[in-house]
């Protein structure tokens, strides 16, 4: 007989080659499942048992993989001895033990047998493994050691043999059924044969029934462990309302104390956070927070959107409402290393949080953040202490997370070195330096916090409670973990840890944007810390980032004479326009003169004469360099001034084109002139701009590559190990709509808006999302990830020119595909931020 078995565990061993007697090394078995088949492959019995934890908990990271929570195993699990006795009884009937990567499972059960003082020896049986070089050479998946094929996972082997996916991977019961089916199929097709095991002839004979088709499934129903764990969690939440429990345990004097989150990552921490700015603001409002800060890693891309979102929220609060208006605090988490210009060795430095107290602080933070990219980028953007000292004015500093300098030195070097670091930051920022205490439920934080309290008292440095948030709600933890896997190209099934065979991941699911009451509950033993947060909030001023567009100064020729120095640009523009009119028109009659003067007056009142002078200068320079220039496009063709200056080559008088479509006197906005150059000449024009205005005043515009509906499905599917076929099929069900719209819009509205075929696909997609399988999980996690920033790039044609050093206005970065700097703000906000944007298009057809 054949016994096929599998286990789910509390994790992985520290040492794979440790003896079974080293019981501390071997994880505990939380599920044991097996099937017993006769000598011809016929299923005799199947069993699956959860094991009740005995003085241990099931780690969250393991629960994420197999779905078995401590609560679920405690509620429906069996004691270890009774499960092992049932297993041993069937084991005694079998001559062969079968598994996938079976050595691991043999060690797990072997260790458990030792724990209960059993003398059963599993190795007395013949062992057959479906994860060997034999199956590796069948599946032919590249990536193995020494140039060989890699050993296939159970999903990969199953998919290869049956061109299908089994959805309950990492449920021992389903894994056993899949392993058994794969094993018998390998025997049926002769891959596993007489040369591998002695029972082949009889088993092969029994499998002849399936000569015309593949070995079928055995029809076993599997309990959805993740759903069952969620049910218990939901039930517990209803029976013990968390908010009420939390509020009841908060000291009365702390209930009315305000709390503000000062350490938050948004979606602009690329591939590291799922939190949308608008959602953070909304949740902060619901929790009556008087302020919130954003502190994205190494960049300030979200600042403008943050200010805008808070302004919108505050404007929505009526004057008679009791809701609290929110103060925005702009910040950034910077990597402070030893020498930011040294790129001979990797030094990511320490993660330190900086908050801007006012507009000047924002400028200094913007400059520091820019230096991190333009001078210090090496794996990550970096600054050093010298840079911090240069731009420290009007900044508040928080000591950071476990990767901050003080915490990191406490954990890795020593207390005295950590204390020296504290004194450096305290002496530099005085009362604007604060120690940051976190309670995510980690042992390393407990060790650090003990010292922070001691340091605070000894050196008179205030402590503030924070929660380093990367996602909005606790239930978003899994989606965030998937995002981290997307970033690193990993599968979620890869265990979290360091070194080969492990991946990066957060230690637990506590890194969410907690409510005020949750934070008060966490720090109820230190109520005075909340006053320190209020002190920081009071130090921060409210300021605007939006401003009118600032044009670079256009140099008027010295020989140009004017009656007014104040109106020099308007006078020179008028001079050039009429000079051009003489070249374009035989006769300047009253109607033409009136039209020109009308346009010049509108341009004067708009305050943008310099813009026209700059554009005509660029076009003139391009022509002189032999660069082909297009005739003009869009509404600018309606301007006779643009025509006379040579900006456009279309006569608006001849074709009766309206100037008001270009620049309306009743609704003045920044004119927008797109300029076409030949593809090769465009670069020469940009070089001219850099030479004329300076490299520190010219930049391209960043673009944000977001995870759209289909790409979020495909990325999530890859991380969760859903088959390519299923991922492709699901992605193709999505019409040209966001997942958010598909799942939140009324079905009648969707039916009205979509073609019948697309609507049918949408209904199928929704139906799949309600399932209990891997396809449903893929869809539902992709819904959370949709819209997350996946990468950054550069705008195809946008160029920014500023009147002074660009970092005086916005933070900048570097880009792989550009020699120019790029703004950290994208095209949607650069004009609102006061930047002159010009579109230089390169066309091969010119």
Regions inferred by a protein language model and the residue ranges of each:
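Conserved non-catalytic scaffold segment of RNase H-like nuclease domains
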Residues: 1-122, 139, 143-164, 170
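Conserved beta-strand scaffold positions in the cores of enzyme catalytic domains, especially
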Residues: 2-4, 46-48, 73, 127, ...
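N-terminal phosphate-binding loop and flanking beta/alpha elements of the actin-like ATPase fold
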Residues: 66-69, 128, 603
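A short alpha->loop->secondary-structure connector
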Residues: 113-124, 372-380
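Histidine/lysine/aspartate-rich catalytic loop segments that bind and position anionic ligands
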Residues: 121-137, 263, 400, 406
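Alpha-helical transmembrane segments that form the membrane-embedded catalytic/substrate-binding core
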Residues: 172-182, 634
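Acidic two-metal-ion nuclease catalytic site recognized across multiple nuclease folds
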Residues: 180-247
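Alpha-helical scaffold/interaction cores of sigma-54-like transcription cofactors
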Residues: 232, 236-846
């Amino acid at each position: 007989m054949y016994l096929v078995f599998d286990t789910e565990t509390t994790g992985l061993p520290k040492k794979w080659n440790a003896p079974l007697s080293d019981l501390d090394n071997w994880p505990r078995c939380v599920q044991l499942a097996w099937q017993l088949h006769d000598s011809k492959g016929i299923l005799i019995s199947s069993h699956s048992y959860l094991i009740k934890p005995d003085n241990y908990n099931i780690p969250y990271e393991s629960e994420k993989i197999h779905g078995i929570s401590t609560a679920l195993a405690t509620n429906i699990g069996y004691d270890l001895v009774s499960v092992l006795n049932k297993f041993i009884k069937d084991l005694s009937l079998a001559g062969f033990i079968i598994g996938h990567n079976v050595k691991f499972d043999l060690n797990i059960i072997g260790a458990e047998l030792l724990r209960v003082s059993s003398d059963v020896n599993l190795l007395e049986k013949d062992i057959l493994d479906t994860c060997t070089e034999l199956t590796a050479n069948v599946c032919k998946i590249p990536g193995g050691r020494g140039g060989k094929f890699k050993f296939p996972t159970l999903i990969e082997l199953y998919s290869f043999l049956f061109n299908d996916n089994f959805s309950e991977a990492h449920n021992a019961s389903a894994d056993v059924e899949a392993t058994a089916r794969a094993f018998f199929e390998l025997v049926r097709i002769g891959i596993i044969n007489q040369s591998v095991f002695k029972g082949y002839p009889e088993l092969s004979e029994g499998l002849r029934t399936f000569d015309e088709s593949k070995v079928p499934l055995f029809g076993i129903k599997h309990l959805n462990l993740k759903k069952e764990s969620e049910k218990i969690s939901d039930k517990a939440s209803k029976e013990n309302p968390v908010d009420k429990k939390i509020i009841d345990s908060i000291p009365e004097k702390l209930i009315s104390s305000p709390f503000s989150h000062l350490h938050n990552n948004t979606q602009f921490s690329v591939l590291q956070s799922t939190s949308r700015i608008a959602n953070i603001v909304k949740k902060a409002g619901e929790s009556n927070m008087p302020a919130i800060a954003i502190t994205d890693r190494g960049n300030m891309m979200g600042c403008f959107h943050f200010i805008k979102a808070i302004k919108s929220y505050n404007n929505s609060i009526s004057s008679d409402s009791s809701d609290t208006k929110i103060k925005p605090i702009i910040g950034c988490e910077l990597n402070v290393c030893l020498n930011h210009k040294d790129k001979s060795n990797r030094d990511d430095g320490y993660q330190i949080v900086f908050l801007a107290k006012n507009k000047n602080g924002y400028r200094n933070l913007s400059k520091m953040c820019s230096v991190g990219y333009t001078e210090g980028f090496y794996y990550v953007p970096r600054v050093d202490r010298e840079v911090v000292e240069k731009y420290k004015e009007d900044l508040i500093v928080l000591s950071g997370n476990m990767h901050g300098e003080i915490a990191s030195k406490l954990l890795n070097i020593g207390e005295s070195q950590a204390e020296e670091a504290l004194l450096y930051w305290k002496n530099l920022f005085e009362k604007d330096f604060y120690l940051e205490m976190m309670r995510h439920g980690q042992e390393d934080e407990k060790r650090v916090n003990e010292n922070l309290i001691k340091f605070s008292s000894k050196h008179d440095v205030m402590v503030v409670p924070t929660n380093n948030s990367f996602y909005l709600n606790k239930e978003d933890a899994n989606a965030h973990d998937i995002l981290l896997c997307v970033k690193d190209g990993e599968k979620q099934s890869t265990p979290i840890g360091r070194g080969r065979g492990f991946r990066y991941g957060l230690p637990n699911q506590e890194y969410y944007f907690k409510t005020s009451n949750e934070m008060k509950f966490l720090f109820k033993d230190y109520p005075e810390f909340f006053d320190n947060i209020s002190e920081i909030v009071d130090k921060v001023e409210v300021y605007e980032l939006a401003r009118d567009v600032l044009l670079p100064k256009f140099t008027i020729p010295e020989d140009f004479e004017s009656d007014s120095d104040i109106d020099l640009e308007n006078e020179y523009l008028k001079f050039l326009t009429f000079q051009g009119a003489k070249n374009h028109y035989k006769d300047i009659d009253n109607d033409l003169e009136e039209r020109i003067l009308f346009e010049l007056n509108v341009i004067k009142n708009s305050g943008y004469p310099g813009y026209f002078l700059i554009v005509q200068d660029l076009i003139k320079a391009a022509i002189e360099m032999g660069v082909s220039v297009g005739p003009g496009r869009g509404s600018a063709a309606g301007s006779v001034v643009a025509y006379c200056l040579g900006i456009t080559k279309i006569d608006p008088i001849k074709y009766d084109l309206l100037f008001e479509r270009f620049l309306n006197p009743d609704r003045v906005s920044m004119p927008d002139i797109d300029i076409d150059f030949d593809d090769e000449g465009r670069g020469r024009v940009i070089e001219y701009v850099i030479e004329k205005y300076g490299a520190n005043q010219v930049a391209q515009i960043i673009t944000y590559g977001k995870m759209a509906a289909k790409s979020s499905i495909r990325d999530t599917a890859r991380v969760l190990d859903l088959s390519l076929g299923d991922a492709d099929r699901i992605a193709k069900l999505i019409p040209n709509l966001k997942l958010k719209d598909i799942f939140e819009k009324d079905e009648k509205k969707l039916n009205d808006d979509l073609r019948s075929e697309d609507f049918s696909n949408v209904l199928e997609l929704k139906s799949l999302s309600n399932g209990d399988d891997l396809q449903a999980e893929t869809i539902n996690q992709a819904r959370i990830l949709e819209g997350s920033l996946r990468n950054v790039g550069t705008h195809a044609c946008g160029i920014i020119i500023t009147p002074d050093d660009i970092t005086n206005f916005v933070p900048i970065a570097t880009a792989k595909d550009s020699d120019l700097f790029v703004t950290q703000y994208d095209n949607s906000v650069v004009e609102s931020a006061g930047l002159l944007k010009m579109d230089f298009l390169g066309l091969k057809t010119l």
